[in-house]
């Protein structure tokens, strides 16, 4: 018992650090104003680790379950201008308050026929109980 167990006295080894995550700028020439999230694809989290049953797996699930790589990240960033949104916020969206008095034409019945409220049962020329309109 006077002899100490060498395993018990040894300090636990620290886990070795892996290689740093790849950056898009390591592989491609990127724009200077590229946001940091696009230069570091390893920052994206929340990708699926649990596999769903293969019977119900779709191609979108297969594509969306993988985290992006440096080859799929954008190299240039074009920020959107909010000029239109600021103008709409000041004046509001355009509102059309006119009354629609045009009788609507149906795509089903063709350009010659109009859908009317009083002709509910025979709105289509071929919709007849006794025989189709081809027999006329």
UniProtKB/Swiss-Prot annotation:
Asked if the record carries the keyword Hydrolase, the reply is no
Q: Would you identify the family this protein belongs to, as annotated?
A: Belongs to the PIERCE1 family.
* Disordered: annotated span: 1-27
In the UniProt record, which is one GO cellular component term? Answer: cytoplasm
Q: How does it assemble?
A: Microtubule inner protein component of sperm flagellar doublet microtubules. Interacts with CFAP53, ODAD1 and ODAD3; the interactions link the outer dynein arms docking complex (ODA-DC) to the internal microtubule inner proteins (MIP) in cilium axoneme.
Where does it reside? Cytoplasm, Cytoskeleton, Cilium axoneme; Cytoplasm, Cytoskeleton, Flagellum axoneme
InterPro entries reported for this sequence: PIRC1/2
Gene field = PIERCE1
Asked if Cell membrane is a keyword of the record, the answer is no
Q: Give the keywords, sorted.
A: Cell projection, Cilium, Cytoplasm, Cytoskeleton, Flagellum
Ranges of Basic and acidic residues composition bias in the record: 1-16
* Tissues where this protein is expressed: Expressed in trachea multiciliated cells.
The molecule here is called Piercer of microtubule wall 1 protein
Which BP terms does GO give this entry?
A: axoneme assembly; cellular response to UV-C; cilium movement; determination of left/right symmetry; DNA damage response; establishment of left/right asymmetry; flagellated sperm motility; regulation of gene expression
What biological function has been recorded for the protein in this entry?
Microtubule inner protein involved in the attachment of outer dynein arms (ODAs) to dynein-decorated doublet microtubules (DMTs) in cilia axoneme, which is required for motile cilia beating. Functions at the initial step of left-right asymmetry specification of the visceral organs.
